[in-house]
Amino acid sequence: MLFRKITEDIRKWYLNSSTGLLIDGARQIGKTTIIEDFLSSNNIDFIELNLLENKLALDAFNSSTNEKELMFRISALANKNIVEGKTVIFIDEIQEAKDAITPIKFLVQKAPYKFIFSGSFLGVKMKDILSVPVGFLTVLPMYPL
């Protein structure tokens, strides 16, 4: 696999940040692959939910009324034990959720996990945002090679 500078940016975030991480970029440039490779190669426990492929995960994001309900649904969908303070929760294709940004703020603020989100065309698709996650989200743009 080619080395990508963003890998080092992800590493710095993982080691030093208490915010969520959002990798934003065009479709099919390797966002999911780079995140999965980083987590796997560093032996980091993680779960992955793809909101485009998993309609139950999308429904969890769209219909949960608070972060506790959303975390309950995420844990049910994970098919593995989620360990507080250890498991990274990776939500792929976050742009599919109708208001993805608002739950991100409350998840990062109140849940004892690290969150990584990835998506495409987020600036175009995001609307009806109820609460902007200022200070709760690190955004890393990713570009094609």
Segments the model singles out, each with a brief description of its role:
Residues 1-145:
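Phosphate-binding site recognition
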